[in-house]
Structures are given as C-alpha cells and as structure tokens.
Amino acid sequence: MAIERTLSIIKPDATRRNLTGKINAKFEDAGLRIVAQKRIHLSLAQAQKFYGVHKDRPFFGELTEFMASEPVVVQVLEGEGAIAKNREVMGATNPANADEGTIRKEFALSVGENSVHGSDAPETAAEEIAFFFSGLELVG
C-alpha cells in the first residue's frame, strides 16, 4: 500500500472539550504521522468555500455555521493507506453507527457535532490539504 497524505479536521465540538490530544493519540496509535498542524478559527466565508461541494445540500448552512463557530485544528496525516486508515479511525459519520473504539463513537455528540472531518479520496485530500497548507508547512 502506498504512503498517502490526508486532511484531518478536529471540529469545534472536540476542540471546545479539549480533545485534540486524545484524538491525535488515536491517529498516531493507528500508525498515522502528523506532518502539519495548526489551530485556526474559520470565518463563515472560509467554511462555505471549504464545504462548497455541499452547497446545495440541506445541511450546508448548519454545517458551515458550526465549523465557523469556534476554533478547529487542521492537520495533515501521513502513512500507508492514510485516507482509508483515517476514515476507519474516525468511524461512521453518525456516531450511533460507529464501531467501538473509533473517534466518533467515543467523542461525537451527534451526527452534526461528530468531532472530526477526513478526506474521502486522494483527489479530495490534495485539494483539502492545499486549502489550508502551503508546501513549506508539510514536514515529512
């Protein structure tokens, strides 16, 4: 399996509860390396641009307002099959359907406040990483 990079966002519900360290421990325990990380507070316009692919979905307004409500931690994870591994560690979008031991099962408050975001494909990962990080910020 190839070494990949993927974007991870620790969402406001998790940063508000100081869960960044616990969430990152789960990524690292799964063999993923954090090669870039920063804590930021998205503006509503930035959240709308980042989630623009969902602009016609009924949850778009609620999602973007939530993502701009408080700070988030954006980071790049690297490892073998990082995209799939990250999604496995995160668990199902709905925490009620997430497997035991996953981030969402353990920390999510609801489908909307589900603690983490992760890229779903190599193309998406590249776009999402470039949205938040320059090449100089990626330290492998």
Curated annotation (Swiss-Prot):
Its main location: cytoplasm. It is found in: Cytoplasm. The keyword Iron does not apply. Major role in the synthesis of nucleoside triphosphates other than ATP. The ATP gamma phosphate is transferred to the NDP beta phosphate via a ping-pong mechanism, using a phosphorylated active-site intermediate. It comes from the Bacteria. Its EC number is 2.7.4.6. Belongs to the NDK family. GO terms for cellular component: cytoplasm. Signal peptide: none annotated. GO terms for biological process: CTP biosynthetic process; GTP biosynthetic process; UTP biosynthetic process. This is Nucleoside diphosphate kinase. It catalyses: a 2'-deoxyribonucleoside 5'-diphosphate + ATP = a 2'-deoxyribonucleoside 5'-triphosphate + ADP; a ribonucleoside 5'-diphosphate + ATP = a ribonucleoside 5'-triphosphate + ADP. Homotetramer. ATP binds at K11, F59, R87, T93, R104, N114. The lineage of its organism: Bacteria, Pseudomonadati, Pseudomonadota, Alphaproteobacteria, Rhodobacterales. It is an enzyme of class 2 (transferase). It comes from Cereibacter sphaeroides (strain ATCC 17025 / ATH 2.4.3). Pfam families: NDK. Keywords: ATP-binding, Cytoplasm, Kinase, Magnesium, Metal-binding, Nucleotide metabolism, Nucleotide-binding, Phosphoprotein, Transferase. The active site is at H117. InterPro entries: NDK-like_dom, NDK-like_dom_sf, Nucleoside_diP_kinase, Nucleoside_diP_kinase_AS. CDD domains: NDPk_I (cd04413). GO terms for molecular function: ATP binding; metal ion binding; nucleoside diphosphate kinase activity. PANTHER family: NUCLEOSIDE DIPHOSPHATE KINASE, NUCLEOSIDE DIPHOSPHATE KINASE DDB_G0292928-RELATED. Its cofactor is Mg(2+).
